[in-house]
């Protein structure tokens, strides 16, 4: 099958542990596709087990935006969009189909909503004004600027809250010319599971990651120079794993608290996807417990021939 003029970006989304990568790889093989990761953590090298890269699943299928930054660096939504557009245009120019795959809502929005992000520079004057504010005052300022604040980690760390205020307050120069966003015609597929089954899959996967050496991976990152505070930014596995390695959690509490936190994270992802639908993104939902590949084929038959 070849891409048609009605779709130039196939997107596969779903909550964590839903089987997105496996579906993306299967469709990439059938559609001459290349996968672009929309995962805020898989961009980092040497963060393999905790982020669930599962690179063995790709086989010969080319992938992009995995292992492109060093641990300790940041990958803002602006950075992701720039990298995504570069990969999208490269894949398209070679006559292949870009397949965006992931569950990071901000990244998916940056690719699908058709507007260019603006790189926000630091504002020394604003930072000086905010320096004497309490954490509660900073949170109130951010929530005033962005009432629909989904990224709760921005409220959990003072520096992140200040940066979020900086971004929300930024007024770009009207004279600043922006390159037009390329015409993207997406077909969006989502994988949906019964809540109880998704919880079982999440718990099973966490056990597998711990057995595969996730804690050793976290320790090696820290030994290699990544501060515990920085590791906190890289997701729940690294945050709770760091607490365990610092002696602040025992093994049982690590598993129970991390497992519960990932379940809550999956709920937030599902909330984000519903928000995307309310904002006009059509998502064709597939039953994860059935045959999502067959379901996907039925949907895409009207777009590819």
Curated annotation (Swiss-Prot):
The lineage of its organism: Bacteria, Pseudomonadati, Thermodesulfobacteriota, Desulfuromonadia, Geobacterales. ATP binds at residues 14-21. It catalyses: adenosine(37) in tRNA + dimethylallyl diphosphate = N(6)-dimethylallyladenosine(37) in tRNA + diphosphate. Pfam families: IPPT. This is tRNA dimethylallyltransferase 2. Belongs to the IPP transferase family. Signal peptide: none annotated. Catalyzes the transfer of a dimethylallyl group onto the adenine at position 37 in tRNAs that read codons beginning with uridine, leading to the formation of N6-(dimethylallyl)adenosine (i(6)A). GO terms for biological process: tRNA modification. It comes from Trichlorobacter lovleyi (strain ATCC BAA-1151 / DSM 17278 / SZ). The keyword Magnesium applies. It comes from the Bacteria. Its cofactor is Mg(2+). Monomer. Residues 39-42 are annotated as: Interaction with substrate tRNA. Its EC number is 2.5.1.75. Substrate binds at residues 16-21. One of its GO terms (molecular function) is ATP binding. The record marks 104, 125 as: Interaction with substrate tRNA. Keywords: ATP-binding, Magnesium, Nucleotide-binding, Transferase, tRNA processing.
